UniProtKB/Swiss-Prot annotation:
The keyword Secreted does not apply. GO terms for biological process: carbohydrate metabolic process; peptidoglycan biosynthetic process; UDP-N-acetylglucosamine biosynthetic process. The keyword Nucleotide-binding does not apply. The modification Phosphoserine is found at residue 102. The active site is at 102 (phosphoserine intermediate). This is Phosphoglucosamine mutase. Coiled coil: none annotated. Binds 1 Mg(2+) ion per subunit. Keywords: Isomerase, Magnesium, Metal-binding, Phosphoprotein. One of its GO terms (cellular component) is cytosol. Belongs to the phosphohexose mutase family. HAMAP family: GlmM_B. One of its GO terms (molecular function) is phosphomannomutase activity.
Length: 451
C-alpha cells in the first residue's frame, strides 16, 4: 500500500504545508487516538516535542485531536525522542507522540508515533491510521461527557536523566573527562548536559540556547565541525553531537576526528562481545553502513544483518532475530538492553564508559576500522520516476558491473525529503566517485527530460 502521509520515520514536511498542517495534525490525533483504545481503562497519550517554532501549533492541534477521541494528554514539553519512548511505558500510556523533524531545519516538522510498548508503529498500524485520515473520522469521536483532558507533567526531565544514568554501572564515574556536548539547540538542551554533570564529567555545553529557529543550524550531529573546533579550543577529551530530537549521536575525538554511527556500533559490539553481553552473534545496520564495518565484524566472527534505511526497520529486525545492537551510519544507535529506539545520550554514555574503563584517549578507542571509500550524493527531484528511465538503468547496471564483488551500490529515494540518494563504496576511490557521478548525471538528465 502506497502511503500518502507516513514516510520512513513518521509524518514529516514543511510546517504549515501539507501534510504538516494543524488540520492534518488534529486528524492524526483523532485517528491515532481511536486506534489505541483497547480495554476499559482511561486512555492516555504522552506528547513531547523538540524546540521548533511550529511545535506549538502541531502540539495544540494534536491535543485537540486526542481529546476529541476521548484520550487524556500528558504534555512533556521539549524532550528527546527516546524519552518519549521510555515515558510511554513508564506512565502506562496507550500511545506516545514526538513532534520533531529530527535533523532537518526549523521550517520542517514531523510526527513520530510510539505504541504502548515504546516501539515505533509498524507499517500495518500506520496503514490503518492512514485509512482513517481520509475517512469521516469525526463520526467515531467521543461523546461530550467522555472527552479527554490535557495536563502538563512535571519532573519528566529528571526521570529521563535517571534512566540514562542507570544504563551505566552504579560505580561508574566520568570524573576526569572533559566533555563538550553539542545539543543542536534541540530537545536535549537541558537533559544531556545535566546527565553528564551528574555522572561526574566536566561539561562544556554548546548550542543549548534554542529560539525556535536555530535547531540544527550549523550545529549538531549533521554539522560536527563546530564541535570539533570547540573540542580543540578547550582541549577536551571528547565531543558529543546530538541532533534536534537527540535520537542520534556523532562523536568527535580529542584530535577533532569524527566518529560516525558505524564506528560507534563497532566499538560497542566489540566491547559487549568480549564481555559476553552481545546477543545473537552480530548486529543490525542498514544498507548504507560501510563495508568496513561488515569486514570488521566478520573478522571477529560476528555477522552484520542489513535492512532498508530507517531505524524502525533496524529495530524490527533486531526484535525478530533476537539481537541487541543495531543502528545507522548517521548515528541512530539502538541498544535494546536499555531502549526501544535510537538514543543519542545513552549511546554516548556507553562510549564514555568504555573510554573510562580503558583509560585511553578517545582517538585510540573509538576508531575501530578503516572505512572503505564511500561516496554519497543526493539528487533533488520534483516528481516523476527518473529511476525508471532507460538511461538511468543502464548507468546503474554499468556501475554494478564495474564495482563487482569488491564494492556496493545503493540507490534509493529518501523517505523524508524529495531526494534520490546515490551511494557507492569500494576499494578503488576513483572508480567509486566516477560511478556515483555517472548515475547522478543520468538521474539529473532524466529529471530534466521529464520536466
Amino acid at each position: 500500500m502506497s502511503k500518502q502521509y507516513f514516510g520512513t520515520d513518521g509524518i514529516r514536511g514543511r510546517a504549515n504545508r501539507f501534510p504538516m498542517t494543524a488540520e492534518v495534525a488534529m486528524r492524526v490525533g483523532m485517528a491515532a487516538g481511536l486506534s489505541f483504545q483497547n480495554g476499559s481503562h482511561r486512555h492516555r497519550v504522552v506528547l513531547g516535542k523538540d524546540t521548533r517554532l511550529s511545535g506549538y501549533m502541531i502540539e495544540n492541534a494534536m491535543v485537540a485531536g486526542f481529546c476529541a477521541a476521548g484520550m487524556d494528554v500528558f504534555l512533556l514539553g521539549p524532550i528527546p525522542t527516546p524519552a518519549v519512548a521510555m515515558l510511554v511505558r513508564s506512565l502506562r500510556a496507550d500511545i506516545g507522540v514526538m513532534i520533531s523533524a529530527s535533523h532537518n531545519p526549523y521550517h520542517d516538522n514531523g510526527i513520530k508515533l510510539f505504541g504502548p510498548d515504546g516501539y515505533k508503529l509498524s507499517d500495518e498500524i500506520e496503514n490503518r491510521i492512514e485509512a482513517m485520515l481520509d475517512r469521516d473520522v469525526e463520526l467515531a469521536l467521543a461523546d461530550s461527557e467522555s472527552l479527554g483532558r490535557a495536563k502538563r507533567v512535571d519532573g519528566v526531565h529528571d526521570r529521563y536523566i535517571e534512566f540514562a544514568k542507570r544504563t551505566l554501572p552504579r560505580d561508574m564515574s566520568l570524573s576526569g573527562l572533559r566533555v563538550v556536548i553539542d545539543c543542536a539547540n534541540g530537545a536535549a538542551y537541558k537533559v544531556a548536559p545535566a546527565a553528564l554533570w551528574e555522572l561526574g564529567a566536566e561539561v562544556v555545553p554548546i548550542y543549548v540556547d534554542p529560539n525556535g529557529f536555530n535547531v540544527n543550524e550549523e550545529c549538531g550531529s549533521t554539522h560536527p565541525m563546530s564541535l570539533a573546533k570547540k573540542v580543540h579550543e578547550v582541549r577536551a577529551d571528547i565531543g558529543i553531537a546530538l541532533d534536534g530530537d537527540a535520537d542520534r549521536v556523532v562523536i568527535v575525538d580529542e584530535n577533532g576526528t569524527i566518529i560516525d554511527g558505524d564506528q560507534i556500533m563497532a566499538l560497542i559490539a566489540e566491547s559487549w562481545h568480549e564481555n559476553e553481553k552481545l546477543i545473537g552473534g552480530g548486529i543490525v545496520a542498514t544498507v548504507m553502513s560501510n563495508l568496513g564495518l561488515e569486514r570488521f565484524l566478520r573478522g571477529r566472527g560476528l555477522e552484520l544483518h542489513r535492512t532498508k534505511v530507517g531505524d524502525r526497520y533496524v529495530v524490527e529486525h533486531m526484535r525478530e532475530h533476537g539481537l541487541n545492537i543495531g543502528g545507522e551510519q548517521s548515528g541512530h544507535v539502538v541498544l535494546s538492553d536499555f531502549s526501544t529506539s535510537g538514543d543519542g545520550l545513552v549511546t554516548a554514555l556507553q562510549v564514555l564508559a568504555h573510554i573510562k574503563r580503558l583509560n585511553k584517549p578517545a582517538s585510540e578507542v573509538c576508531r575501530k576500522f578503516e572505512p572503505v571509500p564511500q561516496v554519497l550524493k543526493n539528487v533533488r527531484i520534483s516528481g516523476g520516476k527518473p529511476l525508471e528511465a532507460a538511461s538511468v538503468k543502464a548507468a546503474i547496471a554499468d556501475a554494478q558491473a564495474q564495482l563487482g564483488d569488491t564494492g556496493r551500490l545503493v540507490i534509493r529515494p529518501s523517505g523524508t525529503e524529495p531526494l534520490i540518494r546515490v551511494m557507492a563504496e569500494g576499494d578503488d576511490p576513483e572508480l567509486v566517485r566516477k560511478m556515483v557521478d555517472s548515475i547522478v548525471d543520468a538521474i539529473a538528465d532524466a529529471r530534466t527530460a521529464a520536466a
